[in-house]
Design a protein with these regions (language model features):
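Conserved non-cysteine loop/helix-boundary elements of the Radical SAM core domain that shape
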Residues: 42-46
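Charged helix-capping and loop-helix junction motifs
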Residues: 47-52, 80-84
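Gly/Gly-Pro- and Ser/Thr-rich, intrinsically disordered tail segments characteristic of DNA damage-repair
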Residues: 80, 114-115, 119-128
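Alpha-helix capping/helix-boundary segments
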Residues: 103-104
């Protein structure tokens, strides 16, 4: 008998209303955002109630949901006004809140009935008994701790019917399930109440301090300054394991990341899910393309976290970043004129005549070309556009759509050959 596979939700991050709309347009089945209170990303451009309402209405047009992360650790006095705040979320149409502190869970359950509760990864759920415990308290979904292995995940799925949400992409915290106090000590900002300063990613000098002896600087003896953060997670080539093991929601980290990141990563995971559910062969055919696409927005090296064993020193960033993005985000498409074969684009980074670029859009559409026939908003021919947010027009040989993105290779020179056999040297 053929096993029926459940389609997992692709859950994308959205730090702003713009990012929410981009995530939904690029295939997210749901997005998670932060509000003005109770979250862990105080610098993520969190949503007002009005923005939430607009986001919920926009997502609904695409059949997508909006969740709100409210996963801070509560201290005495923080609960004031919480009931009213959560009732407002419920009335706006927020599909669920992501919570870790039992105090907030109790407040939501008793003072905002009808608002679905998901357990945050901050609660460190690592076994099926924990999921069953939270189920008894009315929670419908649990975000597993990042420290759970694939073998453990499979066993949890067999023994509980609670919805499982699992991280598949993004930054990894050096502390257990993100519960860290390093930021408190280094910058007097409480990471568990929305103030993480990412102290683990700072550069440090190391000293050898044998007992009873004078400390000795190791500067010069080690190749780079020390940092203690992890590489990023990417499970794009292991999506079959996630689907086969019955994960209900594939979570992408990154509410503070750019629309370039959100669009690219969402696009890839949606394509991966669609391909595998069509056939394993279809997934294998595009797998390397998906992996290559991820490197275009990577800020650090990529690994699989704890899913296939305890991370080694190769999954830690003990020194300088060893890989950098090959591409930079330069523009988004506003409109396309089929007759003239020109696109109006809103610039995000400097663009030059002759730059080699790649257009990409929802549905894993992409093609490469180069910047040709560059004009400003007044119709003047220009060679360079250095100022962000300008409206520009360029010649584009293939049709593109509003909301498509444009990125460029970052450095170097490439000889680009046109169809007529002539070549131009472009910055890459």
């Amino acid at each position: 008998m053929t096993k029926t596979l459940k389609r997992p939700e692709v859950l994308s991050p959205a730090g702003t209303l713009e990012k929410l709309k981009v995530a939904v347009q690029y295939g997210a089945d749901a997005v998670f955002i932060g509000g003005q209170a109770y979250g862990l990303r105080s610098r993520a451009g969190n949503f007002t109630f009005e923005q939430m309402e607009e986001g919920v209405q926009f997502a609904a047009k695409y059949g997508a949901k909006v969740y709100v992360a409210a996963n801070m650790v509560m201290h005495e006095g923080n609960e004031a006004g919480a009931g009213e705040w959560f009732r407002k979320l419920r009335d706006i149409g927020i599909a669920a809140v992501i919570v870790s502190d039992p105090a907030l869970i109790m407040i939501v359950a008793t003072e905002a009935p009808g608002l679905e509760i998901h357990l945050s990864t901050q609660a460190s759920a690592t076994n099926y008994e924990t999921l069953e415990f939270w189920k008894e308290l009315g929670l419908t979904r649990v975000v597993l701790a990042r420290e759970v292995s694939m073998e453990e995940l499979a066993e949890i799925r067999k023994r509980t019917d609670v919805e499982i949400e699992a991280f598949v992409h993004g930054a990894m915290c050096i502390s257990y399930s993100g519960r860290c106090t390093l930021s408190n000590h280094m910058s007097m900002r409480d990471a568990n109440r929305g103030g993480c300063s990412q102290s683990c990613r700072w550069k440090y000098d190391l000293y050898d301090m044998p007992f009873g002896k004078e400390r000795k600087s190791l500067k010069g003896e080690i190749p780079e300054e020390f940092s203690m953060s992890a590489v990023d997670m990417s499970m794009i080539d292991h999506i079959p394991d996630m689907i086969e093991n019955g994960v209900d929601s594939l979570k992408i980290e990154g509410r503070m990341k750019s629309i370039h990141y959100v669009s690219t990563v969402t696009n890839c995971y949606k394509a991966a899910v669609d391909a595998y559910l069509e056939s394993p062969e279809k997934f294998e055919a595009i797998k390397q393309d998906l992996v290559d696409e991820m490197w275009k927005v990577a800020q650090r090296e990529l690994a699989t976290g704890f899913y296939y064993g305890i991370p080694s020193e190769n999954e830690q960033l003990f020194g300088a970043r060893r890989k950098i993005p090959e591409y930079k985000f330069v523009a988004e498409v506003v409109s396309y004129d089929d007759a003239a074969q020109t696109a109006t684009i809103r610039q995000r980074n400097a663009i030059n005549e002759g730059d080699q670029v790649e257009f990409y859009g929802p549905g894993f559409r992409h093609f490469e070309t180069y910047i040709e026939d560059l004009h400003d908003a007044k119709g003047n021919k220009i060679d360079r556009a250095p100022n962000p947010m300008e409206l520009l027009t360029i010649k584009v040989p293939q049709p593109v759509q509003s909301g498509d993105m444009v990125r460029a290779l970052k450095e170097g020179l490439i000889n680009f050959y046109k169809e007529d056999g002539t070549s131009v040297t472009v910055r890459a």
